[in-house]
Amino acid sequence: MEMSRLKPSGRIGDNMKKILGLIGLYALIVLFCFYFFIQHPKNIFDEIYQETAKNYLGYYNFNELKNVTVKNRKLYDSNMNETDKYESIITYDDSSLGSDAKNLELRFNFDGSSKGINIWFERYTNSGEKINFVIHYGFKKKVLVKKIMIYENSSKTYIEDEAQVKSYLEKYGITAKDLDSYYDEIVNQKVLKDWCSIFDSKYSPSNYGEVKVETQWENW
């Protein structure tokens, strides 16, 4: 006598659908959380970069500051052909920086491997020479690099060689602590304070968040 084959009941099939549905929903939640974690700003420079990248072609945060000029510059390729890419440039009025600093500028690169923020400013010493601060935040690696070079008035040239820069600073009695204070008064007390005044930041000038900081003069 041939035995009849057992068929799954409708209830078991419905339960299986519910289980598969819950698994699918859970997977979507995990993917969403992972995406949010990856995209979520890890530090104050991330925050500035991402907000600017989202809004720079319209009205965005830096437009709210009174003493800055905001512009977007169209980029060209190596053959000088126009592209659809831009860099955003924020220039501070010298009058907002005090008597010893000039030419503070932020540039945002939104394309390729060099995505990030470049910050430049000049700090004048008592001798009349100027120290150029060159600061770069790399968006992909989450690294902030702080460097300097010297513009020598007598020769009208920039000194970039580290040994020559150190020798120059020693000649005029400028210490690593002085360089830290010059950086602090412009980047922390000006740029980042301004940012926190126009954006509800999770970070602050004294709490950058998760970022690796490489300072050229750290052990000078």
Model-inferred region functions:
Residues 2, 14-19:
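Positively charged n-region of N-terminal signal peptides that target proteins for export
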Residues 13-14, 108:
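Intrinsic-disorder/low-complexity regions
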Residues 19-37:
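Hydrophobic membrane-insertion alpha-helices, especially the h-region
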Residues 31-125:
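N-terminal export/targeting and maturation segments
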Residues 87-220:
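Extracytoplasmic electrostatic interaction patches
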